[in-house]
């Protein structure tokens, strides 16, 4: 093996960055200071809360107890919200922390729990009416949560939110569902191509790692409006391996492809001369105030 070889893994997010702009992907691997994001912090708090609620030990509670889930969920979310706030404010590059977004986070958590409960095929009920016994049934349906998926070759990886049993109307398992929880804006009709590819990526890794798997499909669960969108289509692993080849480590910066959409959401553009040149030359339209310029102070003359 080449002594200068640097191992790398492709994930759905790094794949998307590479496609949008190879320079963006290259910069993301240079250990530059990351920028905290309020939507990302909220999403992490909701995801981690769902994980904890799925893993609750309810062995010391009565099967018939109700009214326990809303306050338990709130306490768990509040704890993760505080942890995310601390990490957010400790990040050198961060905007204002928005305490008011905890309401949206709470609604997202309720939405996620409602979707999960609906998959149990039990009669629909408010979360306050969910008994301990009912939630144990939900937990028994969850086969895995918040796990890491890695391909056989080790080159592809992803983070699994939930793997659940696909139940029929009688509560019998007929297969598996790979579920990815989404706290962002839901699609109006169909999943966009990148989200569909992400979901199929998880689906295909599970198929590869479990040759004797039952019928399996992938879904995006959108907590904001409690909708479920199924990802259909062929395997994406061959395309992922082709992309992996192009994403090999390079000391030389990869090509920059400035474009309004990809540059607008790039947290590393302050380190990208291509972005600065595109702004200067008019390739990119002037935008609002950009507060992340990175400079080296060479000399300061107070006079």
Locations of regions flagged by a protein language model:
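Short amphipathic alpha-helical segments and their helix-coil junctions
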Residues: 5-7, 20-34, 178, 182-184, ...
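Short, charged/polar micro-motifs that form catalytic or ligand-binding hotspots
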Residues: 5-8, 12-13, 32-40, 149, ...
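Metal-dependent nuclease catalytic regions and adjoining charged, substrate-binding loops involved
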Residues: 9-10, 189-194, 204-290
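Nuclease catalytic cores
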Residues: 15-59, 66, 74, 106, ...
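A non-catalytic, helix-rich entry segment at domain boundaries
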Residues: 52-143
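Mg2+/Mn2+-dependent nuclease catalytic core
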Residues: 137-242
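OB-fold (S1/OB) nucleic-acid-binding surfaces
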Residues: 181, 302-303
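Structural detector for short beta-strands of small beta-barrel domains
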Residues: 285-302
């Amino acid at each position: 093996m080449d002594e200068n070889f640097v191992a790398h893994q492709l994930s759905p997010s790094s794949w998307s960055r590479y496609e949008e702009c190879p320079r963006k992907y290259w910069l993301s691997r240079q250990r530059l200071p990351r920028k905290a994001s309020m939507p990302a912090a909220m999403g992490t708090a909701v995801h981690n809360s769902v994980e904890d609620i799925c893993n609750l030990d309810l062995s010391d509670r009565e099967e018939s107890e109700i009214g326990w889930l809303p306050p338990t969920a709130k306490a768990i979310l509040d704890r993760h919200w505080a942890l995310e706030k601390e990490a957010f404010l400790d990040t050198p590059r961060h905007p204002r922390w928005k305490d008011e977004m905890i309401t949206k986070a709470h609604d997202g958590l309720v939405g996620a729990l409602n979707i999960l409960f609906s998959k149990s095929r039990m009669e629909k009920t408010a979360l306050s009416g969910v008994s301990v016994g009912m939630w144990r049934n939900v937990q028994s349906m969850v086969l895995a949560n918040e796990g890491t998926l890695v391909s056989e070759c080790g080159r592809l990886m992803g983070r699994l939110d939930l793997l659940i049993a696909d139940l029929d109307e009688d509560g019998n398992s007929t297969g598996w569902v790979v579920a990815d929880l989404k706290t962002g804006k839901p699609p109006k009709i169909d999943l966009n191509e990148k989200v569909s590819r992400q979901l199929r990526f998880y689906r295909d890794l599970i198929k590869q790692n479990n040759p004797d798997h039952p019928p399996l499909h992938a879904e995006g669960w959108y907590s904001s409006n409690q909708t479920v969108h199924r990802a259909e289509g062929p395997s994406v692993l061959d395309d992922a391996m082709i992309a992996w080849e192009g994403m090999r480590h390079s000391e030389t910066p990869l090509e920059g492809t400035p474009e309004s959409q990809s540059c607008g959401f790039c947290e590393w553009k302050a380190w990208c001369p291509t972005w600065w040149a595109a702004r200067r030359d008019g390739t990119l339209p002037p935008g609002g105030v950009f507060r992340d310029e990175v400079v080296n102070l060479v000399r300061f003359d107070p006079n």
